[in-house]
A protein has these predicted regions:
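A short secondary-structure junction signal
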Residues: 19-22, 46-51, 70-76, 92-95, ...
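Active-site C-terminal subdomain of aminotransferase-like
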Residues: 85-166
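Active-site phosphate-binding strand-loop segment of PLP-dependent enzymes
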Residues: 1, 12-68
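PLP-dependent aminotransferase class I/II
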Residues: 145, 164-179
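Conserved active-site segment immediately N-terminal to the catalytic lysine
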Residues: 61, 75-86
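Conserved PLP-binding catalytic core of the aspartate aminotransferase-like
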Residues: 176-192
């Protein structure tokens, strides 16, 4: 983002090697921000936001690549959700974008046509040849999720699997999970 605008880092957990999600009370939001971006689940560090940041009238933009479809999400709280399919939806090369209507077309003048969501919205997501195999696989995944109880069932399943792993790590005299318990990912369980 620094190539296109002034960036304000509103919060960081660098002080503890990125092992927790900074509390909302510690965030220093800019009143004139164009948007606030965060990553819902940090894959390598295994830190997950189990809450949605409150940004008032400032659009909230979220990278959900590693935890989309892992639990129900109220998309109305976001200006934009984007996710690469390669973690939970299908093969690499497919990206899901859920954009609030009032944000369509708000781009810098030099934005390439393929990076302007208005282009895709006006062409029903088929401005160019879509990745048909990826879409087919994603459709199979969506059907499987529905047949297995939907997103609420996926969340239950993920909580149960993560609880088993974390219980083992917490009682281990050898392995350690460095992530703050309240912010542990349900999708990625790092340990040393």
């Amino acid at each position: 983002a620094k190539q296109y605008c002034q960036v304000n880092v509103v919060a960081s957990s660098e002080d503890k090697s990125f092992t927790y999600a900074p509390a909302q009370a510690d965030w220093k939001l800019s009143k004139d921000a164009a948007y606030v971006h965060y990553t819902a689940n940090e894959t390598i560090g295994g830190v997950e936001f189990h809450w949605v940041p409150q940004t008032g009238d400032v659009p909230l933009v979220c990278d959900m690549s590693s935890n989309i479809l892992s639990k129900p999400v109220d998309v109305s709280k976001y200006g934009l959700i984007y996710a690469g399919a390669q973690k939970n939806i299908g093969p690499a090369g497919l990206t899901i974008a859920i954009l609030r209507d009032d944000l369509i077309g708000q781009v810098l003048p030099k934005t390439p046509v393929m990076l302007d969501y208005k282009t895709h919205a006006e062409n029903e997501s088929m401005y160019n040849t879509p990745p048909t195999y990826g879409i087919y696989i994603a459709g199979l995944v969506f059907q499987w999720i529905k047949q297995n109880g939907g997103l609420a069932a996926m969340e239950k399943r993920n909580r149960e699997k993560a609880a088993l792993l974390y219980a083992f790590l917490d009682q281990s005299n050898f392995f350690v999970s460095p992530v703050a318990k309240a912010d542990r990912s349900l999708m990625n369980v790092p340990f040393t």
